[in-house]
Structure formats: C-alpha cells, structure tokens
Amino acid sequence: AEKAKLENSEKSLNFAAHSMLEELRGVSDPGLRTWMANEANNLFTRSLTLNPNNDSTVIGQGSTFFFGVSGAPMEGILKIRAIAEKDPNNVFAQFMLGFGGMVSGQNDKAIERFLKVTEIDPQNSEAIFLLAELYERGGDKKNALVWYEKGKKYVENPELMKALEE
C-alpha cells in the first residue's frame, strides 16, 4: 500500500486497494479489519482523483464501508448501486451489493444479487457458495443443497469436499 501511495499511479493504487479489499473478507479481528478498510478506502479515493470514471474503483471504494470505514454504509451502497443501475451486468457491482446485503442481514436482497451474479457468471464459485450458505441460514435446505451441489464441481480441496459430502 505504501509503495502504491508513493508511486501514485491509478494502476498501482487500484491493485493495492483491490488486494486489501479481497483480504478483508477473511479478516475476523475488528481492529485490523477497520484499519485495512480505511487503508483500502484511502487508496481507492486517491485513485479516483486520478480517474473518477473507473467503475471498478467506485465499487471498491463503496465496498470498504461494509468493513468498518468511518461513515454510513448506505453511502457505499449508493455508489455501488449507481454503477449496477448503469450496467446491470457488472458482476463486481452485483456481487458487492449481495455481500453488503449479507453483512447487513438483508438475506433476501443478498440472494437476489448473488442469483444475478450466477446468471451473468455461472462459474462464480464464491457467489454459488454464498447462495448455499444464505439458503441454509434461512432454513431452505432444498435450495441450499442445490447450490452446494453446483459448487462441488469447483472444489479441489479434498477436506472441503469431504465436508460438503456430509
């Protein structure tokens, strides 16, 4: 991140910011997650000063609000939603809106967005497994099984495959 700030090119800022955003989803420590979200937000913001028309950067910056950036999460959702309305087939926008719905407990909206992702990109294994998880959380075992079955063909980890079989 520091190297990207020094270089101050759109490419390096976006690479560092997207890398941090990707890692954020797996961070359980609230302090670290908030710090990383703020760092990613700062990188996205700097990149947007260089190119305010980069949809991926706008979506990424909006997504950082889901992970603890100071401010209202709705601000991030509105930025992402604007891109999704302009381009309904933008997988990144649809995915992050689904993720935002999941984080905020709006599982029906999250399912709707992840279904859209799988329509556009049928091999998006992350959306497939998140759908399975959301259906399972909601008590819809039938749909959970359907999506877990769809996802199994993308699993290469034998331990995970065994867990899915159970």
Ranges and model annotations:
Residues 6-7, 50-51, 85-87, 119-121, ...:
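Structural marker of alpha-solenoid helical repeat scaffolds
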Residues 15, 19, 60-61, 96, ...:
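Canonical tetratricopeptide repeat
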Residues 62-66, 95-100:
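Alpha-helical solenoid scaffolds in eukaryotic macromolecular assemblies
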Residues 40, 55-56, 88-93, 123-126:
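Generic helix N-cap/helix-start motif at coil->alpha-helix transitions
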Residues 12-13, 57, 93-94, 127, ...:
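TPR alpha-solenoid repeat register
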